[in-house]
A protein has these predicted regions:
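Short beta-strand/turn micro-motifs composed of small residues
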Residues: 9, 258, 338
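A short, flexible beta-alpha/helix-coil linker loop
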Residues: 99-102, 158, 304-308
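Non-catalytic nucleic-acid substrate-recognition regions in nucleic-acid-modifying enzymes
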Residues: 2-135
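Conserved S-adenosyl-L-methionine
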Residues: 173-292, 307-308, 312-314
Length: 371
């Protein structure tokens, strides 16, 4: 079955998501703000869930239409082939949002969509009551300037939940963003990665998984596992393919340090859970003592800053030390994510390249130095 799907993502990562989907052989890939649309079959759906490093989830797009009245919304939703996805005992909650639209009340839209789905299923299953005790089929809707998109969430718990980080430090970076920073830094399997503010190890772990080509979702489950819509053989085949693509004989190392001994302990535990502990070298150390011993290195880091853990004055003092330690040298690149507009001034050098990204709700710049 040919499906249209969409992969929501953090703002600024649309290009990375589109490119990884193309590499997975997705068809008709098009990027919009905060999401990427693509086409494929059920195997592609499984492949995207298992392999995407940068998307937040994978949704099936059931329809896109214009609606300015509740009747138009009801009839358009009712016409959709819900019984192809939702069984007679399955659970189907509804959530979504409305922006700059005539139908602006989200609770009212939820009720109308739920009612329309129920009426459609009543006709197909010839029953009047749904216990909703079976697998969850999360229905999502978006209404933007009267344009409605109706979707089914196939992922469940967000794709950033890889399963290796049940514990984290006070200000963790999102896994999808950490993977993106490593990719934007052009990290390769023969590089040496550094993070002198490693926290609970997310950048080091995501970098190691990227270098070894370990699929982020290879060891987790998804909402649509229990639907039966994707054949079990497709899941087995896609997981087997992901295992075959893992690189085991690579010349890769990742060095991490942090001032907090507990953070180093967390990093070691999380790396072991992610099965990349063999690549990591960890130490409790201050940034003032940063003194790498390798000739080449790719440094990617998310230092503490005013809106997270330090006040602005402390953060800018930290940036000055970083500027002294991260000096230009052949074979080295440095990537620092920060929301501080004064970062370059404090660091002492203009970035060779900048990219606007969001760390949670905080607007940041990813400052890249490679010359």
């Amino acid at each position: 079955m040919e499906l249209q799907m969409t992969a929501p993502c953090l703002l600024g990562l649309e290009g990375l998501v589109a490119e990884e989907l193309r590499q997975m052989d997705a068809r008709e890939v098009t990027a919009e703000n905060g999401r990427v649309f693509f086409n494929g079959d059920q195997a592609m759906l499984a492949r995207a869930n298992i392999n995407s490093r940068f998307a937040e989830r994978i949704l099936i797009v059931l329809d896109r239409f214009t609606a300015v009245t509740f009747e138009e919304l009801f009839q358009a939703v009712r016409r959709l082939p819900w019984s192809e996805f939702i069984g007679s005992t399955d659970t189907f909650p509804v959530k979504g949002y409305s922006i700059s639209s005539t139908l602006h009340s989200v609770p009212d839209c939820q009720k109308i969509i739920k009612k329309a789905v129920v009426e459609s299923l009543k006709e197909d299953y010839h029953i009047n009551w749904f216990d909703e005790t079976g697998p969850v089929h999360q229905i999502q809707f978006s209404i933007l300037k009267d344009q409605v998109t109706i979707m089914l969430d196939t992922t469940g718990t967000g794709l950033h939940k890889r399963g290796y980080r049940p514990e984290s430090n006070a200000a963790p970076i999102r896994e999808t963003l950490a993977a993106a920073l490593c990719s934007l830094s052009r990290l390769r399997h023969y590089h040496t990665l550094y993070d002198p503010f490693c926290g609970s190890g997310t950048i080091l772990i995501e970098g190691s998984m990227l270098a070894a080509n370990v699929a982020p979702g290879i060891n987790r489950n998804f909402a649509c596992d229990r639907w039966g819509f994707v054949p079990e053989a497709a899941w087995k085949q896609e997981r087997a393919r992901a295992h075959e693509c893992i690189k085991t004989d690579i010349d890769f190392q990742a060095f991490g340090s942090d001032l907090d001994p507990h953070a180093i302990e967390l990093t070691a535990i999380n790396a072991k859970r992610a099965r990349v502990g063999q690549y990591l070298h960890l130490d409790t150390a201050d940034i003032a003592d940063f003194n790498p011993q390798t000739e080449r290195g790719t440094l990617v880091t998310n230092p503490p800053y005013g809106e997270r853990m330090l006040d602005i004055r402390e953060a800018e003092w930290l940036y000055r030390i970083m500027g002294e330690k991260f000096n230009p040298r052949k074979g080295w690149s440095y990537g620092v994510i920060s929301p501080d507009e004064q970062f370059e001034k404090c660091f002492g050098r203009k970035a060779d390249k900048r990219r606007k990204l969001y760390n949670g709700m905080i607007k940041c710049q990813f400052y890249m130095y490679f010359k």
